[in-house]
């Protein structure tokens, strides 16, 4: 993993999660407002360093952490948001204790956004950004099978999903952010890539429609999966900072 980049002045942290894992991460202190960053599938907290940099520069305290079974956080298996939702809850609680007087926001990317949306009870934060989050595990699996193996493979997705209870002890009904997002009371900004083949645009629109107000949707025309910040860096940072400025300060 290595150390936190020198331009980000922070420290190593670890905290317990209801997933059964001890989560490891970096905590960067700020002047006003705090944000928890939640990475995607099969990567680690370093995926969120670009976001951490501009948020820290704007004065926000930032927590980056590894979900269970990712990076430096131990765990037996990745559960695509199920156990990770407990990690999301633990990270929010850790940040509240670390920054008790600050308003708190979340940015969840792909699986990280699913974990944030699936948390039960719903995360009690002041603002939430959900980027390219799948609405349900069926379509998430079908899209990936089609993306990597071709359209004929979509039918294999159901075989994989049928194995969830046996292999992971998870029912497919537990991996439906679309059923949980309405319980999130915080203002929400949904971000979608128009060329995303993992979470298709109509699926992002469905998830947005299921969410409670207040909410916003931003579609990035040229972006595929998880590359919104890279594709539209200046506009992304402007929109995110504006969204948090209104709600965390």
Regions flagged by a language model, labelled:
Residues 47, 78-99:
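Alpha/beta-hydrolase active-site loop
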Residues 223-237:
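Catalytic histidine-centered segment of alpha/beta-hydrolase-like enzymes
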Residues 118-171, 179, 219:
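Hydrolase active-site cap/lid region
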Residues 208-226:
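Catalytic histidine neighborhood in serine/cysteine hydrolases
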Residues 1-16:
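An N-terminal hydrophobic leader/cap segment in hydrolases
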Residues 41-54, 67, 202:
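The serine-hydrolase catalytic nucleophile loop
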Residues 183-185, 190-192, 196:
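Short beta-strand/loop motif that positions the catalytic acidic residue
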Residues 52-74:
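Conserved alpha/beta-hydrolase
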């Amino acid at each position: 993993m290595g150390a936190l980049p020198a331009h980000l002045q922070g420290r190593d942290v670890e905290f317990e999660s209801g997933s059964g894992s001890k989560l490891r991460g970096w905590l960067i202190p700020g002047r006003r407002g705090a944000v928890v960053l939640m990475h995607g599938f099969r990567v680690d907290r370093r995926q969120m360093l670009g976001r951490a940099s501009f948020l820290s520069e704007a004065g926000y305290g930032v927590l980056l952490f590894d979900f269970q079974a990712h990076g430096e956080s131990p765990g037996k298996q990745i559960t695509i948001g199920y156990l990770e939702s407990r990690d999301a809850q633990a990270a929010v609680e850790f940040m509240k204790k670390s920054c008790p007087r600050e308003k708190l926001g979340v940015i969840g990317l792909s699986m990280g956004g699913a974990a944030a949306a699936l948390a039960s009870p719903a995360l009690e934060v002041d603002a939430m950004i959900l980027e390219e989050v799948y609405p349900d595990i069926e379509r998430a699996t079908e899209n990936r099978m089609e993306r990597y193996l071709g359209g004929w493979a979509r039918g294999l997705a159901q075989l994989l999903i049928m194995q969830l209870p046996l292999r992971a002890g998870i029912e497919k009904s537990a991996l439906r952010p679309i059923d949980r997002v309405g319980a999130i009371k915080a203002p929400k900004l949904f971000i979608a890539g128009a060329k995303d083949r993992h979470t298709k645009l109509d699926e992002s629109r469905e998830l947005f429609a299921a969410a409670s107000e207040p909410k916003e949707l931003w579609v990035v025309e040229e972006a595929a999966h998880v590359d919104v910040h890279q594709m539209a860096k200046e506009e992304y940072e402007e929109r995110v900072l504006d969204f948090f400025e209104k709600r965390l300060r």
